[in-house]
């Protein structure tokens, strides 16, 4: 396709006098800020290819750097705006369609209308891809750009022809009728549009309704059907109908229940049998193999898949895990209407709980291959706009929101009491913990709290005054780090500036989110650094110093695994003394073969030497002595006793460096070597680019700047005397291939993840604690302990790591128990409960960061078998297959002891005895 130019210019055309890069940057920044300060529904934004936008950013940024540093810019002015890499190849140039699954910030950027107009004015190009700003949310309103409008497949009932219709998800049903009728030529009074999801008539849409398409549960790429009054074609009459099944989301929980094997039911849905349990509790002697059937004989529920509505695999995975959580299913398959809290300002008027309960009933009905969770997703998007649209999300984030939302919708506490918290006053931990748990329960009472919430102890210690603060907080799940994500191994080569030892590589373990100070501390311990010594860290690239690491609090994430880092072991210069760095580069001579006119070249090799020197003038002899000291441990044992006198073949004169190759070039003119015969080496003064090379003699005087650079010429004599291989064999910071192999062999246990979660660690600099004794914010040490464990225990494995420089997914295999997960040693409050757990569900993530695919494993406890839920596809799976490196969220249920089981049964008998007594009186 040809990029249009004039069609997309401003009315006044392209500027005859283009702005400078600095002015362009300033104008775009000001217009963007102005737009962010005036967000309104319907504001226009334009999609721009990230590839083109990056080239523009480099152009304006490099030009700005040129102004401040005086260095020339290497980024050229970009050509016309080109969006063709982000649109479908067969798109109409007047109606371009974005490629699916694009990621903002990686594939495209969004700019306000005024910024787009300016960019087109300066660069022309296109095509323009216009999108609208929409406002979403029920309680908390948030703005977002609808990058992918709703795409619907319209089937014309007259001839079964199909047409694509695109509308914003907030467009009304009335607007949909207008557009469909305009496209098909059907009068609005004769048109009937059906929700035709899965090629079935799920509900007739009201032509006068202002309800949005999203609220009507219409989703991306689904079918709609238009029929016309007065036509009774075979096509229209053949269309199947299921009534109005999914047209509306129920506002009351259904009182119908899934039939339980054995016995009649009460009007409220409870079984009359006293030991009723949809999912019998596991005891240490009973693994559930002989449990009762969930449905009638020959029927099996819980094996329905969930249709993918467009990148909703993350939601389906989390839902299947919850849909196989025994106490949650027991609760929602009964009558829970009395627990709905419609007045909770933190809830969703009960609508989320009702939608979830309705979905669970469908999943546990027999005879269903797959269920489309459209009504549930509609409610989810209304109350959690971050999950609207069709981008990939995180199953754990969805799970966290859903559990919290269900709790608030089902919270039996209608008016939360105010309870003044008492100070612990050195009271026993169990007394304080129980008091805080009762306070929590007085304000939060739901099936979610009863089943899923535990309590941990948090201890903070002030590093200055030693003040100890202990709190007890509830938790819904445990987000445990993978130990490999907490630390990293780094290999650094240490050079001894006094010449006492050969260069030595050291591998140290440091916090992954640590600082340069952490690395220097670990390295100092490894190499037995003396108190009067220091380490200077630097990155070596192309045989030159690329950068120094001198700010202690800088993040280690700036150092990549494939870089070469060295540390120079230096004697500390007395405080108050002025110091400068002396960099010593190494050059080896090679006779040019192809171009004899160029004479001889010197190519840089090895690792530079760096040391501190005083700012007093240095002579050539001083520098020669420093070089001799560095090289002394490299002296070959049987090296000839020849002293270098500068008479070797080839010389360095005023030379330049080829920046791309690192080669120093000199003309063929001979240099008088008599003046530097006293020096052990041929030394040349150079600059940071390797330019302005000048030879040094013994009597030369140099006034050191911040950094002074010299180059040592290595000829045959130097190579005979010294082993230069010690300068060339720098290891990388981390060998990734070796690490990956080692990780797979050793793996990680779930216990090591839990121990890393509970380990004492200092708070981050952005998460300081206010010490009540010091009256200051302190970087306190924090320690967590498990205090109270719930019946349903969820582990979230933190596989995704984010930092300023790196986004990554850890595919390390975590070895987690399927049976007999014993957590008793990690629980501080031993109260006689069982701390044995059995795995019953797993949310899996396959692929990389920002995409991939989610599935779920779940155990059907009725028949003691595991199943794989991959969206709508459900298949049986061996228990041995569920442990793999894709495991992301683990669901465990408590294995009760025999005593606990008997106590629970007695409590249940009493409950149902009271219920039967109440019914007898009522009759």
Curated annotation (Swiss-Prot):
Q: Which UniProt keywords apply?
A: Hydrolase, Protease, Thiol protease, Ubl conjugation pathway
Active-site residues are 313, 853
Disordered, as annotated region: 65-91
- Can you tell which superkingdom this protein's organism belongs to? Eukaryota
Q: Which reaction does it catalyse?
A: Thiol-dependent hydrolysis of ester, thioester, amide, peptide and isopeptide bonds formed by the C-terminal Gly of ubiquitin (a 76-residue protein attached to proteins as an intracellular targeting signal)
Which residues are in the DUSP domain?
Answer: 19-134
In this protein, which residues make up the domain named USP?
Answer: 304-895
BP-aspect Gene Ontology terms: protein deubiquitination; proteolysis
Q: Does the keyword Hydrolase apply?
A: yes
One Pfam family named in its UniProt record: DUSP
Q: Note the PROSITE patterns from the entry.
A: DUSP (PS51283), USP_1 (PS00972), USP_2 (PS00973), USP_3 (PS50235)
Q: Which GO terms describe its molecular function?
A: cysteine-type deubiquitinase activity
Q: What class of enzyme is it?
A: hydrolase
For whether the record's keyword set contains Hydrolase, the answer is yes
The protein's Enzyme Commission number: 3.4.19.12
Tell me, in a sentence or two, what this protein's role is: Recognizes and hydrolyzes the peptide bond at the C-terminal Gly of ubiquitin. Involved in the processing of poly-ubiquitin precursors as well as that of ubiquitinated proteins.
Q: Return the similarity comment.
A: Belongs to the peptidase C19 family.
What is this protein called in UniProt? Ubiquitin carboxyl-terminal hydrolase 10
- Say which species the protein is native to: Arabidopsis thaliana (Mouse-ear cress)
Q: Upper lineage ranks?
A: Eukaryota, Viridiplantae, Streptophyta, Embryophyta, Tracheophyta
Tell me the name of the encoding gene: UBP10
């Amino acid at each position: 396709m040809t990029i249009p130019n004039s069609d997309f210019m401003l009315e006044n055309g392209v500027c005859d006098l283009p702005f400078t890069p600095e002015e362009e940057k300033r104008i775009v920044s000001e217009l963007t800020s102005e737009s962010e300060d005036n967000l309104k529904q319907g504001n226009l934004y334009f999609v721009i290819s990230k590839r083109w936008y990056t080239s523009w950013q480099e152009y304006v940024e490099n030009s700005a750097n040129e102004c401040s540093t005086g260095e020339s810019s290497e980024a050229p002015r970009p050509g016309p705006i080109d969006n063709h890499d982000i649109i479908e190849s067969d798109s109409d140039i007047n109606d371009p369609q974005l490629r699916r699954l694009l990621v903002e910030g990686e594939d495209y950027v969004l700019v306000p209308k005024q910024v787009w107009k300016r960019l087109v004015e300066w660069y022309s190009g296109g095509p323009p891809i216009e999108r609208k700003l929409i406002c979403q949310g029920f309680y908390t309103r948030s703005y977002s750009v609808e990058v992918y409008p709703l795409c619907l497949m319209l089937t014309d009932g007259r001839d079964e022809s199909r047409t694509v219709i695109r509308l914003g998800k907030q467009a009304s049903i009335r607007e949909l009728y207008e557009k469909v009728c305009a496209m098909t030529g059907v009068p609005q009074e004769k048109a009937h549009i059906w929700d035709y999801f899965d090629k079935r008539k799920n509900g007739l849409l009201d032509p006068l309704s202002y309800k949005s398409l999203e609220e009507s549960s219409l989703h991306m790429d689904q079918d709609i059907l238009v029929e016309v009054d007065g036509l009774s074609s075979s096509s229209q009459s053949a269309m199947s109908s299921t009534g109005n099944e999914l047209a509306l989301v129920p506002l009351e929980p259904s009182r119908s229940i899934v039939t339980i094997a054995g016995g009649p039911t009460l009007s409220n849905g409870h079984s009359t049998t006293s030991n009723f349990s949809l999912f019998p509790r596991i005891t240490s002697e009973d693994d559930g193999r002989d449990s009762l059937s969930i449905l009638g004989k020959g029927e099996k529920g819980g094996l329905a898949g969930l249709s993918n509505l467009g990148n909703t695999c993350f939601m389906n995975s989390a839902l299947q895990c919850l849909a196989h959580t025994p106490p949650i299913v027991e609760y929602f398959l009964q009558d829970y209407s009395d627990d709905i809290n419609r007045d909770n300002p933190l809830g969703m008027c009960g609508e989320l709980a009702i939608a979830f309960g309705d979905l669970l009933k469908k999943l546990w009905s027999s005879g269903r291959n797959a269920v489309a969770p459209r009504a549930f997703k509609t409610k989810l998007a209304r109350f959690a706009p971050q999950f609207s649209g069709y981008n990939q999300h995180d199953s754990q984030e969805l799970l966290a929101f859903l559990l919290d939302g269900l709790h608030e919708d089902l919270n039996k506490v209608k008016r939360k009491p105010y309870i003044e918290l008492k100070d612990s006053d050195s009271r026993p931990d169990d007394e304080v913990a129980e008091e805080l748990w009762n306070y929590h329960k007085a304000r939060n009472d739901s099936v979610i709290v009863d089943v899923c919430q535990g309590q941990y102890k948090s201890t903070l210690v002030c590093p200055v005054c030693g003040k100890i603060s202990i709190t007890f907080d509830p938790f819904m799940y445990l987000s445990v780090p993978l130990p490999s994500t907490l630390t990293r191994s780094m290999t650094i080569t240490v050079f001894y500036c006094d010449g006492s030892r050969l260069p030595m590589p050291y591998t140290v373990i440091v916090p992954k989110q640590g600082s340069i100070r952490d690395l220097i501390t670990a390295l100092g311990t490894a190499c037995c650094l003396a108190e009067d010594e220091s380490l200077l860290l630097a990155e070596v690239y192309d045989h030159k110093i690329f950068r120094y690491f001198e700010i202690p609090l800088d993040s280690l994430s700036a150092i990549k695994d494939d870089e070469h880092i060295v540390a120079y072991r230096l004697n500390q210069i007395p405080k108050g003394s002025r110091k400068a760095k002396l960099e010593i580069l190494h050059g080896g001579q090679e006779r040019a073969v192809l171009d004899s006119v160029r004479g001889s070249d010197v190519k840089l090799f090895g690792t530079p030497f760096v040391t501190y020197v005083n700012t007093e003038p240095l002579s050539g002899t001083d520098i020669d002595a420093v070089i001799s000291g560095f090289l002394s441990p490299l002296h070959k044992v049987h090296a000839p006793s020849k002293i270098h006198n500068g008479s070797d073949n080839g010389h360095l004169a005023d030379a330049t460096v080829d920046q791309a190759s690192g080669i120093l070039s000199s003309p063929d003119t001979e240099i008088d070597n008599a003046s530097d015969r006293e020096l052990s080496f041929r030394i040349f003064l150079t600059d940071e680019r390797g330019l302005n090379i000048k030879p040094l003699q013994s009597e030369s005087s140099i006034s050191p700047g911040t950094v002074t650079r010299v180059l040592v010429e290595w000829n045959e004599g130097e190579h005979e005397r010294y082993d230069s291989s010690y300068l060339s064999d720098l290891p990388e910071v981390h060998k990734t291939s070796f690490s990956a192999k080692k990780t797979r062999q050793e793996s990680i246990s779930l216990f090591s993840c839990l121990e890393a979660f509970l380990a004492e660690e200092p708070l981050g600099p952005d998460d300081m604690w206010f010490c009540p004794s010091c009256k200051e914010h302190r970087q306190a040490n924090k320690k967590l302990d498990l205090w109270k464990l719930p019946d349903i225990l969820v582990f979230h494995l933190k596989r995704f790591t984010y930092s300023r420089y790196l986004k990554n997914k850890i595919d390390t295999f975590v070895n987690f128990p399927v049976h007999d997960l014993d957590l008793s040693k990690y629980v501080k409050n031993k109260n006689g409960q069982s701390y044995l757990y059995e795995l019953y569900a797993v949310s899996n993530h396959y692929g990389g960061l920002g995409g991939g695919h989610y599935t779920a494993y779940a155990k059907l406890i009725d028949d003691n078998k595991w199943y794989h839920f991959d969206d709508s596809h459900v298949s049986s799976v061996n228990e041995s297959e569920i442990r793999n490196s894709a495991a992301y969220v683990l669901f465990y249920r408590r294995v009760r002891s025999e005593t606990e089981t008997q106590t629970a049964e007695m409590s249940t008998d009493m409950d149902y005895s009271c219920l039967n007594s109440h019914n007898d009186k009522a009759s």
